[in-house]
């Protein structure tokens, strides 16, 4: 059976609110860390979310 190519990751807010999103990414095609501008409901504005390892 083949091992899955997708890895679960956590996108954590850089605003320091502790808010996060979970998603998955293909680790073969995107080996670099992801960074998105997403909405943080605790800060009530769009902030940068950086990838951290899901524990």
Curated annotation (Swiss-Prot):
Sorted UniProt keywords = Ribonucleoprotein, Ribosomal protein
Q: Entry's Gene3D superfamilies?
A: Ribosomal protein L33
> Segment Disordered: which positions?
1-27
* Gene Ontology annotations of biological process type: translation
Q: InterPro entries under this entry? A: Ribosomal_bL33, Ribosomal_bL33_CS, Ribosomal_bL33_sf, Ribosomal_zn-bd
Q: Supply one GO molecular-function term.
A: structural constituent of ribosome
Where is the sequence biased in composition, kind Basic and acidic residues?
1-11
Q: GO cellular component terms?
A: cytosolic large ribosomal subunit
Q: Biased composition, Polar residues: where in the chain?
A: 14-24
Q: Which family does it belong to?
A: Belongs to the bacterial ribosomal protein bL33 family.
- HAMAP family recorded: Ribosomal_bL33
- List the NCBIfam families hit by this protein, alphabetically: PRK00595.1 (NF001860), rpmG_bact (TIGR01023)
Q: Which protein, by its recorded name, is this?
A: Large ribosomal subunit protein bL33
Gene from which this protein is expressed: rpmG
């Amino acid at each position: 059976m083949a091992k899955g190519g997708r890895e679960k990751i956590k996108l954590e807010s850089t605003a320091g609110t502790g808010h996060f999103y979970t998603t998955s990414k293909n680790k073969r095609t995107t080996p670099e860390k992801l960074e998105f501008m997403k909405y943080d409901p605790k800060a009530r504005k769009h902030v940068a979310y950086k990838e951290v390892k899901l524990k």
